[in-house]
């Protein structure tokens, strides 16, 4: 990708990369703090923490790809953001992953219909067979915005690649 991107695209890739590395790093620090302050660490708890660390490591991986302007950087970054768009809890299972900033709007249907808002930096909620009465869904508006930004970048990269390729036709 390096050979056919403008300074503007490279600047945006750098910003996206730093954002994802920042979010992943904050998430890892939160997990380390949770492990350090946990009163009881069982094998299952450690396994869950390692599972969560994989998500934040993936965010750092995506950011690194962006900084190195790798061809698959934007594809991986979209995947990373899609994982962050929707958080939910239903029948004892909950999943809510955010690496970076979040601004959420959600519905809590546990006891009644309640509109929720949230904001912060990096979070992870994972429950398996726990809080079975909990029923909620959250939408991360920041992740939506980042996906939109990445899609614009993808289009711009494709356009620039086509311009470079067509301008090189006939040159030898």
Question: Predicted segments — roles?
Answer:
Residues 1-172:
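Topology signature of small-to-medium multi-pass alpha-helical membrane proteins
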